[in-house]
Every structure is written in C-alpha cells, then in structure tokens.
C-alpha cells in the first residue's frame, strides 16, 4: 500500500501531467492533422476530429464499476483527476464522467466487447477480473474496442489502468503513469 504522503505527492505530480497534456494539445493536433491527411482524410475532416473540449469540474465522489449498481470510492489520484476537469475530449481520447461510464457500460456494443475479451483474450482485464473490479476510464473508439479500464485490485489502493487499442494491451500501475504515457514519457 502506498503511504499518504507519497499519494499526495503523486496526486500533485498527476496535476502537472494533466496540465502538460492539456497544454500540449496544439502539438498533438498538428501531428494528428499531418498523419490523418497522409492516410487520405481531407484537411476539413481532420480538423473536425482534432478538437479538445474540457468540461467544467463537477462533483464526483465515486466511480461506477461494470457491476450494475456498484461503485468504488475515488482514490486520491482519481479525486485529483475529477478536481482538475470534468468531461474531457482530446482528439480521439475521451476521459469519461461517471454518468458517461454508466451509459457506455450498458450498451450492447460494450457488453459484447467485454464478453469477447473474457472469451478470447486470456489475461485481459475482463478475463481476470469480475465486473465489480472494473471501471471504464476513457474511450478512444467504441466501435473499434479502444478502451482504458480501471482495475481495482485491493480496497484502498490506487486502481491500475489497462488500455486496449487494436490488438495491444498497455498496463499502468496507476493514473499518473497512464498520463505520463499519454504525454510520451512512460515509465512502464
């Protein structure tokens, strides 16, 4: 278990990483525009996708799990994330508010993805953990099954973040390391 002082320091570091991610949007947008147009997307289409929208902070006290009606209290880092911004869309990444988690988790498409992961991807988060130990953190593409999940291993500990994109899985010890990865400074 991580000590209180260490967690407070990590939550402050997370705020720095979130700020960096927010303020480096212009660089990511320009890189995205070049890449998207190189694959045949028109500049107008690419610009329509290359947006950042950050909603106001809303009170969040718990995170719903995939188990209907069950939630987990926010860890210190999740509390820092929700104290920093509300709904957050950045090009393809969409960091969700709890009500959005509930909406997406109830869709047939998402439930089918969870079922497929449990049946066909050995050692994936849905394969290894029950719905009461999984939450949805962000979505890059619902259609393609690009999701970042929170994995609640032990009560009182920071949840891990497991990201799925195409046929790849990326695991992070906690939210701070996930944001470092988003910023291109991964330690894992």
Q: How would you label these PLM feature ranges?
A:
Residues 1, 187-188:
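Short intrinsically disordered terminal tails
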Residues 134, 155-158:
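A short, compositionally biased
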Residues 146-153:
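Short, surface-exposed beta-strand/loop micro-motifs that present aromatic residues
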Residues 46, 159-161:
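Short linear proline/tyrosine/threonine-rich motifs used for host-factor recruitment
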Residues 143-146, 167-168:
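Glycine-centered tight beta-turn/hairpin loop motif at sheet-sheet or coil-to-beta transitions
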Residues 163, 167-187:
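Compact, glycine/acidic-enriched structural inserts
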Residues 1-144:
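A surface-exposed partner-binding patch
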Residues 86, 111, 119, 150, ...:
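Short, low-complexity intrinsically disordered segments
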């Amino acid at each position: 278990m991580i000590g209180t002082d260490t967690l407070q320091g990590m939550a402050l570091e997370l705020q720095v990483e979130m700020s960096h991610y927010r303020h480096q949007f212009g660089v990511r947008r320009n890189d995205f525009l070049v890449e998207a147009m190189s694959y045949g997307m028109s500049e107008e289409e690419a610009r329509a996708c290359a947006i950042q929208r950050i909603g106001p902070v809303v009170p969040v006290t718990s995170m719903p799990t995939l188990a209907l009606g069950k939630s987990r209290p926010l860890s210190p880092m999740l509390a820092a994330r929700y104290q920093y911004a509300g709904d957050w869309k950045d090009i393809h990444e969409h960091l969700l508010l709890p009500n959005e988690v509930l909406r997406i988790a109830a869709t047939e498409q998402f439930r089918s993805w969870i079922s497929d992961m449990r049946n066909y991807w050995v050692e994936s988060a849905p394969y290894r953990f029950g719905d009461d130990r999984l939450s949805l953190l962000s979505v890059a593409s619902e259609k393609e099954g690009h999701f970042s999940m929170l994995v609640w291993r032990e009560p009182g500990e920071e949840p891990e973040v497991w990201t799925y994109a195409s046929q790849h899985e990326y695991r992070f010890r906690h939210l701070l390391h996930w944001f470092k990865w988003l910023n291109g400074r991964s330690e894992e």
